[in-house]
Amino acid sequence: HPTSLIPLSWSMRSYDLDVVVTRGAGIESRHRVHAAVVDSSDRLIGTAREPETVTMWRSCAKPFQVMPLLASGGFDEVGWGDDELALASASHGGEPEHVAIAESMLRDLGLEEGDLACGPHEPLSPRGARIVRDAGARPTRLHNNCSGKHAAMLARAHFSGWTLAGYERDGHPVQLAALQEVSRWTDVPEAKIIRAIDGCGVVVFGLPLDAMARAYARIAVAVSRGDEIPTRIARAITTRPFVFGGSDRFDSLVVEQTNGRVISKVGAEGVHSVAVFELGLGFAIKVEDGATRAQYPAVLHMLELLGALPEGLSPKLADYARARIRNTRGEVVGELLPASA
């Protein structure tokens, strides 16, 4: 693939990447970014700061967590399709369309909202949050951005004859199957993967950043080969970008802007993983201080360096690339910008 698109500095030394917060002509704050870029041969070809730094994969692991359900045949047995698969892989915005799919998934299993182990939170999408407020309602577990993943995990337990209670807990067969899948794609032995509790209650995996990039590079390669399970996941995400994120959600906009040539997966605390299909690449970043506001400019900056973005970002995606900072009068007083050395 065209490695000439990779900055020479990445193959020679660590590429120091920051996202700076400006105010006027000055820099007010600085977010340090760690990154790893892996190619189709599993080679680490680009780094920013400490590519081996260990952190939690958070929601970036979702495409791998749903793989055991697909492999078991349970997904097809219940008759689900691309909408359900996109939602199971998503950090969705909690809009009515997302809630309806999650509710339908539970209904197909003979289950209800109370069977979900995730707690409720306000929809991540401003549209979704506004709809809940205007209805005078409270968010439910279905609005949780991980409700699709949880429904898929319940399906895995249901069709395997495992107990549904505690499906989210470390040691449950559902979580052990996910651990095995993560280990297989990252090449990190199960015993060396840190296990903790994610924001939604399921097991979360801690591993090196370059291992995360390796897994997403392998997804890109597997899709190019036509491997069934990765291809089905990629097809669901790229043909259902709204389900995968929502109105103006970053992951959805990246899929749309690149016509499905790139899959971007957001995670909490400034972690992000990306597969670039045409280049057979995967990369992962971690904003050191966990600031979400810094991860989007960093991801878009790296996609630009790799030549993976078309010329001329859509206005909505451009807002993520250089987020404007406004004061209480609505005046633009600064912005977030990627800066490298």
Question: Whereabouts are the PLM-identified features?
Answer:
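Beta-lactamase-like hydrolase cores
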Residues: L5-E52
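Active-site-adjacent helix/loop patches that line small-molecule binding or acyl-intermediate pockets
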Residues: L5-M12, G81-K192
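Short glycine-rich loop/turn motifs
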Residues: R30-A35, A151, L179, E269-H272
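A short glycine/serine-rich beta->alpha loop
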Residues: A48-M56, A88-H92, A135-N144, A196-V203, ...
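Active-site SXXK
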Residues: W57-F75
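Residue-level preference for non-acidic, small/hydrophobic
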Residues: K62-V66, M212, G280
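Bacterial peptidoglycan biogenesis and beta-lactam-recognition machinery
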Residues: A71-V78, G110-G114, S160-G166, H172-I193, ...
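Structured C-terminal helix/loop/strand segments within mature extracytoplasmic catalytic/sensor domains
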Residues: A217-A341
